[in-house]
Amino acid sequence: MTQAHSKSCFHQFWDGLQIKRSSDSFTVELLPSLGATINHSNKLQKFIISPYDPRYRSWELFLIVLVVYSAWICPFELAFLRDLPSKLLLVENIVDIFFAIDIVLTFFVAYVDSKTHLLVDDRKRIAMRYLSTWFIFDVCSTAPFQPIILLFTHKGNDIAFKVLNLLRLWRLHRVSSLFARLEKDIRFNYFWTRCSKLISVTLFAVHCAGCFNYMIADRYPNPEKTWIGAVMSTFRSESLWTRYITALYWSITTLTTTGYGDLHAENPTEMLFDIVYMMFNLGLTAYLIGNMTNLVVHGTSRTRKFRDSIQAASEFAARNQLPENIKQQVLSHFCLQFKTEGLNQQVMLDCLPKGIRSSIAYSLFFPIIRQAYLFNGVSGNFIAELVMEVQAEYFPPKEDIILQNEGEADVYIVVSGAVNIITTIHGNEQVYEKIAEGEMFGEVGSLCNIPQPFTCRTAELSQLLRISKTRLREIIEENREDSNILMNNLVQKLKLRESLPDMNQPDRRFLSKYELFHVPREAWLLKKSQLHYTEHTSRDSSNNTPVFGGDRYSRQLLGEATRSSASENENSSMTDKEENHDEVHTNCEIKKRTEEHCIQINSEDSSSTYSQRTMNATVQTGSPHKTEENITRRIPDEYYIKEANKRVTIHKYRHNSTVSAAQNGKLIKLPTSLEELFKIGSQKFQGFHPRKVVSRDYAEIDDVSVIRDGDHLFLLEM
């Protein structure tokens, strides 16, 4: 005896549903027990048939056709055929032969043990199981009773013989098993499978009741005192078709409780049968109505929930007096949710194993993410890791996705539709830019750790890919080379912007947290490449003064293209000499400390040592009563800077302020050891003797190799 053969999953669950075998699909095998080795041996004993064999499944389907024939002919013979025609008798015997073959075949068909769920192919166990269960019923439903009775009594049309023929209705259990498998078959619609089953049960009940009621009338001594004889006195001489249709008519009117009254019981036997039939109809009607109601309610439940949510949202908006535009956004959200509920992308993906989710995400999102400018040139591994974090979402028209001055938000890529980039100028909203398919938004605020500079609102029904800012940063940190390419793409994108519209209530955190250039956003978004921040307000080259107002202090910015030269000392900051330069007056409040920031940005021409794409930013920080210190940082457009040319900005950390508020920075070349760094700090800051260095995030640094070009280092005395 071999048990086991761990055989498939799919057909065990579907109870024997046949699926085409292939290396890329589920095979007809059973699930092994936990910890068992899968499929060591799938070969059954000799002459043993697998219940999942395609040929055996075809044989079962052929028998289903014969079962349907037997279910119809048995009640019909009992009621309408007193003498069985020889041709019909031959057909009956042929059908019985097929079922007799199936009885023999069953002794060689393996079965699944109900306790172990393993396939049993031992002949003795198969025989014992069959003999102790359905063998007797199968034999009785297949035995040729008419030839046996003719052999002993020579009366083949006896009523007892015909009643014994009803044992063939036992074969209907095969139809029940068939419908059970079809209901779980993904190739067939569940609704129509259930409807077919209910219709089949109803038709069979109508057929049997009509045949039995006619048999009672046909064998009643007084034909005129029967339900059919009362309206058709010579009904026995009528055609078989007329009598059969009349019987079905009575049966269906009684089943549906219509009861026209033209056909009714005339004798006690018929009355008794009608009572039993109508009692049966109560249960059958409850079964049919219950199942149909369940199917219909299940199909309309989504619509009912949608209408309830719309009504609740409308009442909520009216009760709280929400503006009309917000109310429309809420209603549009529910409408779109109803339309896309059937998709259930994320719910479905969460139910799948990680390997399948990876394949689906790679197939759907990889081409879209690859086309985004931010990821242009990054490695395929970076994209492959990123697609796993992408979620596809739908947004209705005019829905705000990101709000201006909102905290850090996620990054979005437009798959379809369009998104308007909106800015508020003097209280009025203006469309600054329109994001089309394949473009992205939200990346500036997320990557630069700043509030969102714009409001992003859908212009039409849009499908967006949302990338979590947290996961994006983690992936960037894990892929240092790709992060350089990515940030360079962001820099190039920002340099393409020629101007920035005036904004009300600018958030000063934008200036303090923006670590990419360490200059205000107005500087890197202006068309001109050189700015000057000094004490007094002047004008730009066009005699225009862009105003960025809205907080308690006014800010006026002027830009002018100038050329200047600067000399660089190895361990000192570059100092730019200003001659006849326009001036910008800036007042701001950072962390409750009001200081004046003077920013000067110089760009070299094509004859300079560096290319025109290299921008020199000189940031002067101080107050009117302090000596200004100059900080110069050059930001190249190349992907990286050679290790030998690492330059960092050192700050004297004051214990009564935060790290981000440390002032008086010095730009130096990074030495080879911390001791040299402390020595340079002592030279640059007189009377200061540092013994410890921390990063901008207050992380202690104990090895110069972890310091990157352009880092800001804060020296502490311990």
From Swiss-Prot:
Coiled coil listed as a keyword: no
Coiled coil, from the record: none
Stretches within the membrane that do not traverse it: 246-265
SMART domains per the UniProt record, alphabetical: cNMP (SM00100)
InterPro entries reported in the protein's UniProt record: cNMP-bd_dom, cNMP-bd_dom_sf, Ion_trans_dom, K_chnl_volt-dep_EAG/ELK/ERG, KAT/AKT, KHA_dom, RmlC-like_jellyroll
Topology, Extracellular side: 82-88, 154-162, 219-245, 266-269
Biased composition (Basic and acidic residues): 575-584
Domain KHA: 647-718
Residues on Cytoplasmic side: 1-60, 110-132, 184-197, 291-718
GO molecular function: voltage-gated potassium channel activity
Disulfides per UniProt: none
Localization in the cell: Membrane
Binding residues for a nucleoside 3',5'-cyclic phosphate: 374-493
Keyword terms of this UniProt record: Ion channel, Ion transport, Membrane, Potassium, Potassium channel, Potassium transport, Transmembrane, Transmembrane helix, Transport, Voltage-gated channel
Membrane topology value: Multi-pass membrane protein
Disordered: region residues: 560-584
Annotated Gene Ontology cellular component terms: monoatomic ion channel complex
Residues that span the membrane, as ranges: 61-81, 89-109, 133-153, 163-183, 198-218, 270-290
Compositionally biased tracts (Polar residues): 562-574
Family of this protein: Belongs to the potassium channel family. Plant (TC 1.A.1.4) subfamily.
Function summary: Probable inward-rectifying potassium channel. Assuming opened or closed conformations in response to the voltage difference across the membrane, the channel is activated by hyperpolarization.
Notes concerning its domains: The segment S4 is probably the voltage-sensor and is characterized by a series of positively charged amino acids. The pore-forming region H5 is enclosed by the transmembrane segments S5 and S6 in the Shaker-type (1P/6TM) and contains the GYGD signature motif which seems to be involved in potassium selectivity. The KHA domain (rich in hydrophobic and acidic residues) present in the C-terminal part is likely to be important for tetramerization.
UniProt-listed PANTHER family: POTASSIUM CHANNEL AKT1, POTASSIUM CHANNEL KAT2
Official protein name in the record: Potassium channel KAT1
Organism field: Oryza sativa subsp. japonica
